[in-house]
């Protein structure tokens, strides 16, 4: 079986000037064909200086297969590169958020969403064709107000496929076990979806640099369940972001294992607030 995202890599980590015009036009046409006047789902991208990643993300979204009517919108966090131009070239309605942070950008997308459900999308991430449908299927279940999923990293010269598989398998197991009692700790913004009305009611924190999505999940718990989806058709693929913050993949693995062991008690207890 081939790698589903392989063709998108030809425009990933590349400036927009190098993007084939045929690809841009294909993405534009396919996205136009997906946009609904009466969406059930809002697919909301945020991006800050994501010129080298956004087209690949949009290309993957243009090939979504979804039984639910949807809209795709974007939020440009006042980028200094050609991020906004890519939204325009691909025909994606977008909004400019001048206050910088993921929280402000997510909130901007939420405020403009028309769908019953809001799907977080990160511009440096690619999503499989059935991603949105699978997430919404979970949200449609009685009592579910939010859904989180899993993600993989793109293998490269510094990160072997097998090394990544070991790292991801260990991380996935921990996130899954954690999701039973403390699902908010298993939520990551790039693979998170939720009820639009309830998120507007709780709001999204804008006073923190990271963790606004987990905090939103914590607030949503008062209304129902945060489900955890492990299906491969809901598994996104992304670059390295914070996984490289601790140096090598092995060092990242050690740091995360140590943190997991220190917090192992949390796997068995619920928590209503964090300080």
What are these regions (language model features)?
Residues 149-155, 163-185, 189:
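Short, flexible, basic/aromatic active-site loop/helix in glycosyltransferases
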Residues 130-161:
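Conserved donor NDP-sugar-binding/catalytic core segment of glycosyltransferases
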Residues 40-42, 71, 215:
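Cell-envelope/extracellular polymer assembly enzymes that use nucleotide-activated donors
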Residues 209-216:
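Acidic donor-binding loop at a coil-to-helix junction in glycosyltransferase catalytic cores
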């Amino acid at each position: 079986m081939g790698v589903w995202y392989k063709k998108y890599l030809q425009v990933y980590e590349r400036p927009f000037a190098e993007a084939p015009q045929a690809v841009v036009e294909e993405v534009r046409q396919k996205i136009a064909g997906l946009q609904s006047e009466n969406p059930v789902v809002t697919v909301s991208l945020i991006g800050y200086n994501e010129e080298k990643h956004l087209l690949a993300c949009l290309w993957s979204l243009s090939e979504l297969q979804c039984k639910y009517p949807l809209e795709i919108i974007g939020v440009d966090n006042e980028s200094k590169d050609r991020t906004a131009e890519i939204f325009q070239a691909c025909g994606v309605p977008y909004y400019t958020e001048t206050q910088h942070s993921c929280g402000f950008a997510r909130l901007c997308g939420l405020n403009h969403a028309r769908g019953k459900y809001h799907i977080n999308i990160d511009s440096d991430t690619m999503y499989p064709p059935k991603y949105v449908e699978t997430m919404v299927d979970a949200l449609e279940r009685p009592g579910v107000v939010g859904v989180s999923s899993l993600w993989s990293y793109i293998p490269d010269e510094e990160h072997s496929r097998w090394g990544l598989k070991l790292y991801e398998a260990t991380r996935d197991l921990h996130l899954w076990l954690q999701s039973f009692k403390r699902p908010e700790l298993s939520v990551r913004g790039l693979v998170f979806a939720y009820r639009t009305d309830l998120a507007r009611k709780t709001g999204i924190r804008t006073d923190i640099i990271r963790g606004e999505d987990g905090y939103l999940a914590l607030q949503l718990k008062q209304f129902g369940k945060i489900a955890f989806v492990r299906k491969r058709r809901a598994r996104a693929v992304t670059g390295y972001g914070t996984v490289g913050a601790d140096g090598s993949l092995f060092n990242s693995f050690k740091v995360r294992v140590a943190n997991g062991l220190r917090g192992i008690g949390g796997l068995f207890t619920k928590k209503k607030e964090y300080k």
